[in-house]
């Protein structure tokens, strides 16, 4: 059977309309995931054991269960407890950001632990407050070291965002499926969707390498 894009080409603008939703989901989820990931990483390196246990348990749960399960619990399960339906967009953001935070926290923790311990000891000896030490000394160095890993997590988040199609959110993937249903040809719209995601990943990869080169030039 030959590929025939004649019926799919008119559907491309419809598929591209889902790009705005995809990008909004990724950007909002990435920001929330990064903030929560920083908090979790600080809990993991703290000396207060309950914080360590909570952060490790959180990471274990969200890394040890499928993202699609987490999304379906948020969208289909939580309303059963809360008594009201959660908006599709925010259900997607909650699930993706909570999942991403688990991975980001491990990346940041590793970045902080890779910094020479002598710097932390010197800051403590000089009486630098913990918050100021983290904000001005350790976190900037950690982010400099882990920027490639953070970009990789953003790329993963971009690709995983396609999973929101299971709750009917009109992203690129969902619209590609709808275009296939309208034309009775599913492969061609899915190829178009694949190309869109591929271009997004290429752009993020280019940005990540540019940032990495910039950071190296500042060393």
Curated annotation (Swiss-Prot):
Topology term for the membrane: Multi-pass membrane protein
Gene name, Swiss-Prot/TrEMBL: artQ
Transmembrane regions: 19-39, 51-73, 88-108, 149-169, 187-207
Species classification: Bacteria, Bacillati, Bacillota, Bacilli, Bacillales
Any single GO CC term annotated in Swiss-Prot or TrEMBL for this entry: ATP-binding cassette (ABC) transporter complex
One Pfam family this sequence matches: BPD_transp_1
Gene Ontology MF terms in the entry: transmembrane transporter activity
Protein's job: Part of a binding-protein-dependent transport system for arginine. Probably responsible for the translocation of the substrate across the membrane.
Xref: NCBIfam families: HEQRo_perm_3TM (TIGR01726)
Principal subcellular localisation of the protein: membrane
Disruption phenotype: Cells show impaired growth on arginine as the nitrogen source.
Keywords linked to the UniProt accession: Amino-acid transport, Cell membrane, Membrane, Transmembrane, Transmembrane helix, Transport
Coiled coil: none
Any one GO BP annotation for this protein: amino acid transport
The protein's name: Arginine transport system permease protein ArtQ
Limits of the ABC transmembrane type-1 domain: 19-208
Compartments in which it is found: Cell membrane
Family to which the UniProt record says this protein belongs: Belongs to the binding-protein-dependent transport system permease family. HisMQ subfamily.
């Amino acid at each position: 059977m030959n590929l025939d894009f004649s019926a799919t080409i008119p559907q491309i603008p419809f598929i591209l309309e889902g790009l705005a939703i995809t990008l909004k989901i990724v950007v909002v989820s990435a920001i929330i995931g990064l903030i929560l990931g920083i908090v979790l990483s600080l809990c993991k390196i703290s000396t207060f054991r309950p914080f360590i246990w909570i952060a490790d348990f959180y990471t274990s749960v969200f890394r040890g269960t499928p993202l699609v399960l987490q999304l379906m619990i948020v969208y289909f399960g939580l309303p059963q407890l809360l008594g009201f339906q959660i908006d599709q967009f925010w259900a997607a953001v909650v699930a993706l950001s909570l999942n991403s935070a688990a991975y980001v926290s491990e990346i940041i923790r590793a970045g902080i632990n890779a910094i020479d311990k002598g710097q932390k000891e010197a800051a403590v000896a000089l009486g630098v407050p913990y918050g100021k030490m983290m904000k001005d000394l350790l976190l900037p160095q950690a982010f400099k070291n882990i920027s490639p890993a953070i970009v990789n997590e953003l790329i993963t988040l971009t690709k995983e965002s396609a999973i929101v199609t299971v709750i009917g959110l009109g992203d690129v993937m969902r619209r590609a499926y709808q275009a296939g249903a309208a034309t009775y040809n599913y492969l061609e719209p899915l190829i178009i969707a694949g190309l869109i995601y591929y271009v997004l990943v290429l752009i993020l990869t280019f940005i990540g390498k540019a940032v990495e080169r910039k950071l190296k030039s500042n060393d």
